[in-house]
Amino acid sequence: MDTTILRNRFRRQFGTSGDLYFSPGRINLIGEHTDYNGGFVFPGAVDKGITVEIFRNGTRQVKLLAIDVEDTPYLEFSLDDSQKPERHWACYIYGVCKELEKRGVNVGGFNAAFTGDVPRGAGMSSSAALESAFAFALNTMFADGRVDKFELAKIGQATEHNYCGVKCGIMDQFASVFGREGCLIRLDCRSLEYEYFPFDPQGYRLVLINSMVKHSLGNEYNERRASCEKAVALMDRQFGGVQTLRDANYEMLEAVKDGLTDDDYRRARYILDEKERVLAVCKALEEGDYELVGKKMYETHWGLSRDYTVSCPELDFLVETAQKCGVTGSRVMGGGFGGCTINLVRDTVCDKFTSKAQREYAKKYGIVPEIYQVVIGNGSRKLQ
């Protein structure tokens, strides 16, 4: 990412220059709706993210310039303020400061400007990138980096919970902090144990297509979580030792099927299927079998669409278009009901696929979808 504009705006605003830090957005190749079921997710950091320029100012004041924000891009707050800032974007930074202070870091005042190339609303977690960039920078500046990476990821999650009203899991922040070039991370959402797997798809590209729609979730998320919890309760009562669907198997689920609605049963079965798919994809990557990876991505999409019912016509249309174009793998990425599809595409069909997807989607829905090609990159870091 070119930092010239950031450098110039910082110097114009604050009359000096600072240090540069970067934290990436993320993709999740497979492992969807598994986090709150104690399962595995399989994210990776991408080459798009948030870049921060920052300089200690020797006071208790924090002075912020959000270059990409049109309405009220400049804001100040005191580290002694007990109330979070009014601007939503500043709450992320205020929260990171407060969470670092809870962990014994003596955060001082600073001037900062930031910009990013993570498309907002595309499901690549721009908010986690922002939290991680400031957590990494402030930890380096005021604590000589003594707060470890696990804790930095937890600081981002706690910021969402305590200052932004979002009860998220830890995957987004974890991927942003722990990302490694050429690798995906299999993260165990129960134990937070993790393992890197090589992702170097020679002859393939990772392409995200933004449907540009976001249907209201309403109570949909809670309904699906409740379905999983009903199945867990029945299996635990009958077999014992079932705390989440991670602890269950197909035989257990079949044994309690009569006590579940059809929707509840299919949703629980999807989670069991997805657990197996994540493990299969890890093995396929170790063997360099990207065709099998793609096959499992399609299976995940149609499981999310037909069993977990979190897709929508627009996303199904994009995945069907991918299949017709011979794309290796495609699925909805994220919570569903809109957002992006993630596609594993051979170089030889990429241009044909993206042009057809844009043309056919615009013809059907009257919206031109945005397309982003991403590369798996490193996590939070100081830039030279």
Question: Regions from the language model: what does each represent?
Answer:
Residues 1-26, 51-86, 183-329, 344-384:
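C-terminal nucleotide
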Residues 1-21, 27-30, 36-40, 77-79, ...:
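Gly/Ser-rich oxyanion-binding loop with an adjacent helix/lid
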Residues 38-45, 224-225:
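Short Gly/aromatic-enriched secondary-structure transition segments
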Residues 43-45, 53-56, 87, 104:
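Short, charge-rich binding segments
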Residues 337:
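Glycine-rich phosphate-binding loop
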